[in-house]
Amino acid sequence: MATLGFIGTGNMGGALARAACKSIPSDQVFLANRTVEKARALAEELECRVADNEAIAESADFIFLGVKPQIMADLLAEIGPVLAKRESRFILVTMAAGLTIARIQELAGGNYPVIRIMPNTPAAIGEGMILYACGVGVAKAEENVFLDAMTGAGRFSPLPEKLIDAGSAVSGCGPAFVDLFIEALADGGVACGLPRAAAQEYAAQMVLGSARLVLESGKHPGALKDAVCSPGGTTIQGVRTLEEAGFRGAVMDAVIAAYEKNFDLK
């Protein structure tokens, strides 16, 4: 049974640790965090183990690097000497935006096998969309072990590494865009007289159901939009207002801006 070590238990690291504990024995999962109390609290919740960075680097089969891109160099400088002494096989798993597999290897000081992933926050409830690319040193059997261990996080989609940044601008940043949309829908409902809690529930469930309809029907979103817009009806008037406000262009610009920010992080 593979052991998984998570260095960094913030929003994404913590979400993936939760997912791992759904799929493998929790005593095979190790957590480390700069604030030890945070790792300890999550470990108690998940009934897994607390460790430190060095211990995870020494022994975990899959080492999840759950830190921000800006401090990845410091982390890998810290654990690099430990990795260099290892005789057992291990795989680094990076989720840092903008940092390529080659850059992670460079910072770690060795041509180590790396899996680059781009998860999103819904992974915390098993509904994530996780993009991933395996470096050349990762065997197919190891990829399968990784996927089996992380199946509780949601959907996984392999992607050429050159497209990870583009994909992350949609699926990784997208939850924030959708949350903003849900909030705006709820605000509109409140403006029309709905209680806040009801407006938020209606908006969130509508987005959830609409997303599932796209996935399960296989229909183009435009066709599903057209099906709701009756001639001379209320929906088409709302759509017209969104179009006049530049809704599509604003969403596209948000994705492009998020994508371009990756280049500042490299």
Language-model regions: role of each:
Residues V29, A39, M72, P195-Y202, ...:
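Small-residue helix-packing motif on alpha-helices
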Residues L16, V36, L46, E54-I130:
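Rossmann-like NAD(P)(H) cofactor-binding subdomain of soluble oxidoreductases
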Residues M1-E58, F62, E127-G128, V190-C192:
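NAD(P)+-binding Rossmann beta1-loop-alpha1 motif at the extreme N-terminus of oxidoreductases
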